[in-house]
């Protein structure tokens, strides 16, 4: 199979194809982030990097040979976490570049397969626009079925379709629920605070870092305090609490809960304590915390990998921030494996 992957990110598509036993002859990757390219070439050095997607007409590709096109066009303008500029926003409008490329390939190979992914919080209007452009309506799958992460996504594909009375729809069934919970992805070394940031209101005395007075630790706390994070978590009546905009005014944190401190300055925020699962990883991922053995700390790199279904250490050649950026922007590996399992032999 010859594959063209647009907005390739951390190369989840290639890994998923390998995992389900589909032989890849050539894999073209369009990606501009240097650390994403570094990770891709580390795992799959035969990947052919073609560069900026907006310069696709300059690419040296045998277009008629492409069997599968993958696209995870930027979703920032569609996401509930973004500014809701919509499909015509400066980033999400790259979807139409994907459409141009797909139509170009179809002129040589009408049977080319495709997969397009985008956020579940996209508006009905934008979903309709994308569906009409692709000629098929999406299936909606939450990664919580196969991982410990709540990650709601739309997937458009002609890998398997069915006709309804009015439309053609993506006919990928829901994957079986694996029952993976947040507590299942927390690493055994949870209480080793030399490698974890412990966050509590004010200075941390109980169950704090072994080096609470170190310069880096204090600077980290100061940064979090400046944006309001430390004042959100506090102890009272032998309970760990997180401030929320509810009648009670707080949520109680219990063992193995995930704490979401995104939008720390919001005065209307609810649901900061998530039971059982983690909220969706995002590109800026430093706002998720785990609570275990009296310790509150940021999720570590291995835990982020597990939340997206990757093997431990998959991103170990990168820093935590760079790995988190790719994982937060990327696809959930077991979901893509599930979709690709329906590809018929060529």
What is the meaning of each model-derived region?
Residues 1, 24-26, 46, 63-66, ...:
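A general structural motif
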Residues 56-68, 75-280, 296-297:
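Class I S-adenosyl-L-methionine
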Residues 320-321, 331-337, 341:
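Catalytic phosphate/metal-binding cores of nucleic-acid and nucleotide-processing enzymes, i.e., regions
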Residues 294-317:
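FAD-binding beta-loop-beta segment adjacent to the flavin cofactor pocket
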Residues 35, 204, 332:
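Conserved Rossmann-like nucleotide-cofactor binding loop
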Residues 29, 50, 70, 115-116:
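Generic enzyme active-site microenvironment
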Residues 4-55:
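SAM cofactor-binding core of SAM-dependent methyltransferases
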């Amino acid at each position: 199979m010859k594959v063209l992957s647009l907005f390739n990110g951390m190369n989840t598509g290639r890994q998923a194809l390998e995992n389900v036993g589909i032989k890849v002859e050539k894999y073209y990757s369009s990606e501009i982030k240097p650390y994403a390219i570094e990770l891709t070439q580390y795992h799959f050095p035969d990947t052919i990097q073609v560069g900026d997607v907006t310069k696709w007409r300059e690419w040296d590709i045998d277009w008629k040979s492409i069997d599968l096109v993958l696209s995870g066009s930027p979703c920032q303008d569609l996401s509930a976490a973004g500014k809701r500029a919509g499909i015509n926003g400066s980033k999400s409008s790259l979807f139409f570049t994907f459409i141009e490329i797909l139509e170009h390939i179809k002129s040589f190979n009408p049977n080319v397969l495709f997969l397009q992914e985008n956020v579940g919080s996209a508006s009905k209007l934008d979903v309709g626009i994308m569906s009409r452009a692709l000629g098929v309506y999406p299936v909606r799958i939450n990664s919580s079925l196969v991982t410990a992460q709540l990650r709601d996504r739309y997937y458009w594909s002609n890998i398997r379709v069915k006709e309804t009375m009015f439309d053609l729809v993506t006919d990928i069934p829901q994957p079986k629920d694996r029952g993976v919970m947040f507590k299942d992805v927390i690493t055994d070394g949870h209480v080793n605070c030399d490698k974890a940031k412990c966050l509590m209101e004010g200075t941390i005395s109980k169950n704090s870092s072994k080096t609470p007075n170190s310069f880096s630790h204090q600077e980290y706390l100061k940064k979090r305090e400046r944006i309001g994070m430390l004042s959100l978590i506090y102890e009272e009546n032998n309970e760990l609490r997180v401030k929320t905009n509810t009648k009670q005014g707080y949520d109680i944190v219990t063992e193995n809960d995930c704490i979401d401190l995104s939008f720390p300055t919001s005065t209307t925020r609810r649901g900061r304590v998530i039971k059982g699962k983690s909220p969706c990883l995002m590109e800026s991922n430093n706002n998720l915390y785990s609570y275990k053995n009296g310790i509150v700390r940021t999720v570590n790199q291995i835990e982020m990998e597990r939340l997206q279904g990757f093997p431990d250490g998959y991103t170990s050649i990168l820093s935590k921030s760079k790995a988190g950026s790719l994982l937060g922007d990327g696809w959930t590996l077991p979901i893509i494996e599930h979709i690709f399992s329906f590809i018929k032999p060529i």
